[in-house]
Amino acid sequence: MTIALDQLLTPDIVRPARYLGNELGAKHKEWASAVVRWVLTYPEVYEVGASNLGHIILYNILNAQPRQLCDRTYLPAPDLAQKLKQTKTPLFALESRRCLTDFDILGFSLSYELGATNILEMLDLAAIPLTWRERDAGNYPLIFAGGQTATSNPEPYADFFDFIALGDGEELLPEIGLILEEGKLANLSKEELLLDLAQIPGVYVPRFYDVTPIGAVIPNRDDVPKRILRRVATPIPAYSIGLVPFVETVHDRLVVEIRRGCTRGCRFCQPGMLTRPARDVQPEAVIESIEKGMRATGYNEFSLLSLSCSDYLALPAVGMEIKNRLQNENISLSLPSQRVDRFDENIANIIGGNRQSGLTFAPEAGTQRMRDVINKGLTNEELLRGIKTAVEQGWDKVKLYFMIGLPGETDVDVIGIAETVRWLRRECRLPKRKPLDFTLTISNFTPKPHTPFQWHSVSTAEFIRKQELLKQEFQGMRGVKVNYTDVRISAMEDFIGRGDRSLGKVVLRAWQLGAGMDAWWDNTEKAYQAWSQAIEESGLTWKYRQVEQGEWNIFVDADKDILERPLPWDHLDTGIDKKWLEEDLKRALDAATVPDCSFEGCSHCGVCSVDFGHNIVIEAPAIPAFAGHFQPNQERAQRIRVWFGKIGEIALVSHLDLVRLFDRVVRRAAIPISFTGGFHPGPRISIANALSLGATSSGEIVDFELTKVIDLETFKQQLRAQLPADLPVYQVEEIPLNAPAATRLLEKAEYLLTFNSEGIDCQQWQNWLEAIKQATVMEREKTTKSGKKVTINLREQLYELELKTVDKQAVLCYVGSCRNDGTLLQPDHIVEMLERVSGQELSLLNFHRQRLILGA
């Protein structure tokens, strides 16, 4: 079933463009051409999911497979979710706009412990039963999950999924697709199909495994593996080039992975343990993908992604080469994760410049002893050297991440966080420079599966006490902003993160009680109360495993019996030897460190093998000479005025998003745009007037200023080639360089308004229009931006008003004031005047801007 979006995306829906599925890079494959039809479902709002690199890569890979089709969907925002429920409309896939039950398989990204309630919400909105047992009774798509949380411990969510994809999906998902295709052609039953899938390394089918009384997960049949292997793949940067959303996303840039895996061995870090071995991407592949991607997408920023970018030895050379190649295009680079001990002048050069990105480092602990306990591999001297380098290279603020509640932590270690910041501010002062500002995030440590600290227990009460301790220490400290993670979120993460299969009923009940978007600050209290009630109703406590198995505080009671008990994730073969984790835990007790095996000796964790491969570390190539930072070309050689339309679904793209769209279009078209000056140079592109969201137009105007003269027809063709079809170009003309901008010349606008006219004849409309035209004063009270109330005369802003057609709908045309100083006669003002003279409530169906009228 295909969903009619025009009935759903009414004016009350916020940011409707996120539901269109017509972004640049979206794949629209013929439905009939596919044997297997996928939906990649991201259980977060569009702005989060559409910019997730793993989501983009798998979407591109699946659509590259023959006879396979892949669409996307995301968690609808509350307004659309409510509309779906009210209208009994099922959740749909964006590209095909078909309901999710039309597809063969739905894959959810489960990369966060609290994402499960969002998944249940999406299944419910799609009218799909929540558990695999319920779905067995009908004809529903296969439901599976992948991602870090699914790979680390799927047991709390096992009731909801037909299977789990463990590890990297680049090779695994196409293999699953082939089995589905063969199974479909052979008309296999669901159980037969799942049994075939269970033979693929990396596929875990929970129904084929039971939980023993002591908590071990074992097969309930002989033809499935006892332990399920985590899949490992090599990153393919070319698949990172993809979606360019119309709306602004949380990572509104091109992202390319440069290194997968981390061997630093931080004992708290689950991603570092679950993604081994480390695999560097060839520098040439990174450079080629970024250069191609920036030109194909029009982004003005790119990010190099890794768990630790600084451990990619080619980073300075790769970054410098890209910056040099794109020097004249006002491009900036951000590094989301870098080691402070590797931050130097070379890295500063590649991320500095006019659009200097922020710097974020993670010392994690405030004392050397605690950093050794967690095997951070960072000394005070290295920390100071890195921060000093940042100051010397022009940064005046830095973000730092710390954790509290770590194993073996004392109040001295907690206070050490404040003392470290105080020390850094003092030591990093430079003459004639203001002191360095810090933004701190203090997170609460929650133990994760497959780490040496997986046996440890944490205390919410201790989190609260230590947060108060730090608040006292930071009180009055200037230039320091401190953010604390909500302890309720940490409690929910810890409860579910190391749970077993019995928690499925708690997850389900929490969702039924209103949990969802649990980590969003405005939902936290509601979610926490729902989880609390669900836990209580289940006869458990927030510390249910402590109640059953005793205290887990490894630094108080390192009971060997506790360490040898089965864990809910022991049946997953991640490559890390459980005995090695136990030994590393003992090393932590002694604050003994383990070197990084990518650059020093093997730590014998167990990963390096035929199944998982070995570390791939590429030596640092020579760093090219720095060509210098971007210097904005402010030359103004030509001004071009373009008349364009905004029709169809592009009407649902906001004005601010349209501004960003034109910036990217100009970059993709390689038009030599002139830039403004200052610290934040921007392209000289000026849209004459903002059009209301949802309105169409055939008379919009935008001005471009270029650094060199271009033939108008060439300019028109280049622009058209990169614009969406629903942004047609009608006319292009050159205007004098010193001519006023269209924004200043704008005087009037002509609109067509379409009303519901049932029960209203032509004469009535004519009488109402005549009454308005005969009036000299029709006042309306307006509140200014400053809050002042002023009275305006709407009638003096109306120049023309006539009736075009009347049938079941009446079409009116008016010309009114449209100036950028706020003098603007809007369509709803015309509705207000009509309702005054008619004494009736009228229904405006839509409006269209015919043209903008410029003055002399």
State where each predicted segment sits:
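Radical SAM enzyme core and accessory elements
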Residues: 2-27, 34, 38-40, 477-631
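N-terminal [4Fe-4S]-dependent radical SAM core
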Residues: 9-39, 46-47, 206, 210-255, ...
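N-terminal pre-triad scaffold of radical SAM enzymes
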Residues: 40-44, 62, 243-270, 294, ...
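Conserved SAM/AdoMet-binding glycine-rich loop
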Residues: 40-45, 114, 292-439, 443
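Glycine-rich beta-alpha loop elements in corrinoid/cobalamin-binding modules
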Residues: 75-218, 452-501, 507-523, 528
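Canonical Radical SAM [4Fe-4S] cluster-binding loop centered on the CxxxCxxC motif
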Residues: 248-284, 604-617
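Short, charge-patterned binding micro-sites
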Residues: 447-449, 674-707
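Core RNA-modification/binding signature centered on pseudouridine synthases
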Residues: 634-637, 658-660, 770-856
